[in-house]
């Protein structure tokens, strides 16, 4: 935390215990940020970390009401999960806070007994403040540029830290909160679908953003845990294929998801549609093999009033690279996905 290390230890050389440790409901190696890594626990150099000058209100529930404030001495590891279970995992931020841990522990050795802390890595919740000085304006300032550990000192600051810990501290938690705020006031006339980027089909096609469909979207968003790689190109290709569907249950039907025999030539024309991809990094995984789409001229597209459009390869879209994420996006933008629609 705020986000765990990856297998390649992308944060550089950190002092992490080689013993496996049961903490916050999972098995980790605990890491010490007080030596050569203070920048990870300062809001000046890590935008995701707790900022004493910021406010951290609880996120919104699917019905628009707020989740409860977290408890500083019994803070939820996942504030969203706390609403779904009678026995949520919690941490006492007054005595047992760990700023960073590594889930990719060594397979050998033995598990440390729960509750022990032989290396002294657990402490009261803390943060570092960046100081002025020579060499302190670099991307990763040395430890000498930071203050000693500062702990929440007022009830207001402790409440803010507890809420940050329960609802904001990781990219996944922050994404849930931000997406909820972005969509909570969207009109019911909008159609929303959703999926994970690791699946080979669209989990939930577009539906009117109302009633049970609206509630189910927020519940899925706030309960789904991230996992696996980031095959963004294949994910976008899957969505593009979905938008090409002429099924009476497909995205262009009057009632998507309902099998009613509607023919494709009666679908509504010129309906604006988009796909939003959320990821924690660059794309990986398979290659859909679309080629250098943005580097080639497109076919003509007919529109209303006998108007036509043809993509002509050029700046700012064209390049010399094939099968990029931009090529997949262009593949489904440059073509008429529903040529039979009148």
PLM regions with names:
Residues 1-342:
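P/S/T/G-enriched low-complexity
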């Amino acid at each position: 935390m705020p986000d765990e290390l990856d297998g390649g230890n992308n944060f550089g050389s950190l002092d992490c215990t080689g013993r496996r440790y049961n903490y916050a409901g999972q098995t980790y190696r605990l890491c010490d940020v007080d030596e050569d890594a203070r920048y990870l626990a300062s809001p000046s150099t890590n935008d995701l970390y707790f900022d004493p000058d910021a406010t951290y209100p609880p996120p919104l529930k699917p019905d628009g009401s707020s989740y409860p404030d977290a408890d500083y001495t019994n803070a939820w590891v996942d504030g969203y999960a706390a609403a779904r279970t009678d026995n949520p995992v919690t941490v006492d931020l007054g005595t047992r806070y760990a700023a960073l841990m590594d889930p990719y522990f060594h397979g050998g050795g033995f598990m440390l007994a729960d509750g022990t802390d032989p290396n002294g890595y657990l402490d009261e919740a803390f943060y570092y403040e960046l100081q002025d000085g020579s060499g302190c304006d670099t991307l990763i300032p040395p430890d000498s540029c930071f203050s000693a550990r500062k702990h929440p000192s007022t009830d207001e600051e402790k409440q803010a830290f507890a809420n940050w810990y329960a609802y904001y501290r990781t990219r996944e938690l922050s994404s849930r909160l931000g997406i909820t705020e972005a969509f909570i006031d969207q009109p019911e006339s909008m159609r929303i679908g959703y999926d994970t980027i690791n699946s080979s089909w669209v989990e939930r096609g577009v539906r009117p953003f109302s009633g049970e469909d609206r509630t189910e979207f927020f519940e899925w968003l706030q309960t789904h845990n991230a996992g696996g790689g980031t095959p963004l190109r294949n994910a976008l290709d899957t969505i593009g294929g979905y938008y090409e569907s002429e099924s009476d249950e497909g995205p262009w039907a009057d009632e998507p998801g309902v099998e009613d025999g509607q023919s494709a030539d009666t679908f509504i024309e010129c309906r604006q549609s988009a796909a939003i991809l959320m990821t924690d990094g660059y794309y990986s995984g398979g290659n859909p093999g679309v080629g250098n789409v943005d580097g080639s001229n497109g076919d003509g597209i007919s529109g209303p009033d006998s108007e036509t459009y043809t993509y002509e390869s050029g700046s700012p879209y064209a390049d010399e690279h094939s099968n990029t994420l931009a090529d997949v996006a262009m593949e489904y933008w440059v073509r008429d996905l529903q040529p039979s629609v009148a």
